[in-house]
Design a protein with these regions (language model features):
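N-terminal cap/lid segment of alpha/beta-hydrolase-fold proteins
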Residues: 6-27
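Conserved acidic catalytic loop of the alpha/beta-hydrolase fold
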Residues: 84-101
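Conserved hydrolase catalytic core segment
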Residues: 100-142
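Alpha/beta-hydrolase
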Residues: 147-236
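Short beta-strand/loop motif that positions the catalytic acidic residue
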Residues: 241, 247-249, 253
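Catalytic active-site module of serine/aspartate enzymes centered on a nucleophile-bearing elbow/loop
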Residues: 270-304
Length: 304
């Protein structure tokens, strides 16, 4: 999976925000390189995949992966909306000494990346959304249609409210962490399409389990708050997106069905969509980082 290149050294940073919260992020790459902000999925940790870190080095960008509030050591922000991630991203960029950046969001990170494109002004120059969910109540999109059983159960609990959702997620967290890699695999089984089943082995399976461990080490706050935010208004208008948006969607995705990608491709201005018939959800994380980052790198280098 890692190829022959040596990845840049990855460092973890914790900063204190103006409101007193802690923000947790990883950074990899040269300080002077253009910055890509990585917003992971739900409920993924923010430690960079080796394939993503390597792709960043190849394309000449620095990458910073942010743990949203409630994940890892980032302090919870109760009742947060999707849009609430934007001030955190800007604060992280300020600490890193970066004025302009691009944003990549995968799966549950996708809406948050779009929020940056809509609300961060001229500081965000481009967005990539990979296997991103669409808005819950969007006209013309049946959010749950085509999703695997696990996702249907999860969002069904979210609609019943925070108490019921938390009860479910606490149980799932215990099962995942207690059973190791096999627990992670079992938790994903109902949403793994054939292409994703093929890659959920070996080093990648270990990374995914460690990612879940990192995200959930302090509880399920981030996971639950993500789910609740997805079932509510996102807090911004997609029509406000004026930056280039690169959309990647696998046609064999059971976590986020391709209808979400097609809907976003129509709804988002300046969207350049790639709908890939052979890909699922996890295959995008493993096999496509270099292509995804190449789009963003071109936009960032164009700002020089």
């Amino acid at each position: 999976m890692c190829g022959s290149l040596v990845a840049m050294a990855m460092t973890r940073q914790l900063i204190t925000l103006a409101d007193g919260r802690t923000l947790d992020f990883f950074v990899s790459g040269d300080d002077g390189a253009p910055l890509v902000v990585d917003l992971p999925g739900t409920p993924e940790g923010h430690r960079l995949l080796p394939s993503l870190e390597e792709a960043a080095a190849t394309t000449g960008v620095r990458i910073a992966a942010l743990a949203r509030p409630g994940y890892a050591d980032s302090t919870r922000l109760p009742g947060r909306t999707v849009a609430d991630v934007v001030p955190d991203v800007l604060a992280m960029a300020d600490v890193l000494g970066v004025q302009q950046f691009a944003v990549m969001g995968t799966s549950g990170g996708g809406p948050h990346a779009l929020a940056c494109g809509a609300l961060a002004g001229d500081r965000c120059v481009a967005v990539a959304v990979v296997s991103s969910v669409g808005p819950w109540a969007a006209e013309g999109l049946d959010f749950l249609d085509g999703m695997g059983e696990g996702n249907e159960v999860e969002f069904g609990a979210a609609l019943e409210g925070e108490k019921q959702l938390r009860k479910l997620l606490v149980l799932w967290r215990e099962e995942i962490l207690a059973a190791g890699e096999q627990g992670t695999l079992a938790s994903l089984q109902s949403v793994l399409s054939p292409p994703d089943q093929k890659v959920m082995t070996g080093e990648f399976a270990r990374h995914m389990h460690e990612s879940f461990q990192l995200a959930l080490e302090n509880g399920v706050d981030g996971w639950g708050d993500d789910d609740l935010a997805f079932t509510r208004p996102w807090g911004f208008d997609l029509a406000r997106l004026g930056v280039p948006v690169f959309l990647w969607q696998g046609e064999q995705d059971l976590m986020v069905p391709p209808a979400h990608g097609r809907w976003l491709a129509e709804a988002v201005p300046n969207c350049r969509a790639r709908l890939l018939p052979e890909d699922g959800h996890l295959t995008m994380l493993l096999n496509r980082p270099a292509e995804i980052l190449a789009d963003l790198a071109a936009e960032l280098h164009g700002q020089d």
